[in-house]
Amino acid sequence: MHRSHRLKKNEQFQAVFQRGSSAANKQFVLYSAKQEGQAAFRAGISVSKKIGNAVVRNRVKRLIREAVARMESDIPVGLDLVIIARPGVEAMTLEAIEQSLLHVMKRAKVIKQAPVHNGKRDGKRG
């Protein structure tokens, strides 16, 4: 995920919380809001201190960023996303995080179908 595709400022996060809709599963809460006139989607990540110390929180953020980068072609442009990690995500692998994010994005109707990985659908690799 490119740096220009990240939400950084508190005002940007607050705008998504106020204007957007939310969806959740056991590991993540996803807020999404349309933002007209953007060339790409933007995403912000929030990992609370309940998750662990700074090393653990930063690892979780890196894994979430990588999972979002893998889904980048499936996320429509003109969206602002805020991803909030819930406790328990720190023990997950990258693949598990990617599947959980895909699930919550489908619930939020951000992604319409399963992304294609290596020519196969439904997330199975091979």
UniProtKB/Swiss-Prot annotation:
Check the record and name the Pfam families matching this protein: Ribonuclease_P (PF00825)
Query: What is the native source organism of this protein?
Result: Brevibacillus brevis (strain 47 / JCM 6285 / NBRC 100599)
**UniProt protein name:** Ribonuclease P protein component
Q: Does the keyword RNA-binding apply?
A: yes
Entry function:
RNaseP catalyzes the removal of the 5'-leader sequence from pre-tRNA to produce the mature 5'-terminus. It can also cleave other RNA substrates such as 4.5S RNA. The protein component plays an auxiliary but essential role in vivo by binding to the 5'-leader sequence and broadening the substrate specificity of the ribozyme.
The chemistry this enzyme catalyses reads: Endonucleolytic cleavage of RNA, removing 5'-extranucleotides from tRNA precursor
Q: How does it assemble?
A: Consists of a catalytic RNA component (M1 or rnpB) and a protein subunit.
PROSITE patterns xrefs: RIBONUCLEASE_P
The GO annotation for biological process reads: tRNA 5'-leader removal
Q: Which family does it belong to?
A: Belongs to the RnpA family.
EC assignment: 3.1.26.5
Q: What class of enzyme is it?
A: hydrolase
Instruction: Cite the PANTHER family for this sequence.
Output: RIBONUCLEASE P PROTEIN COMPONENT
Keywords in alphabetical order: Endonuclease, Hydrolase, Nuclease, RNA-binding, tRNA processing
Q: Which domain of life is it from?
A: Bacteria
Task: Write down any Gene Ontology CC term.
Answer: ribonuclease P complex
Query: Per UniProt, what is one GO molecular function of this protein?
Result: ribonuclease P activity
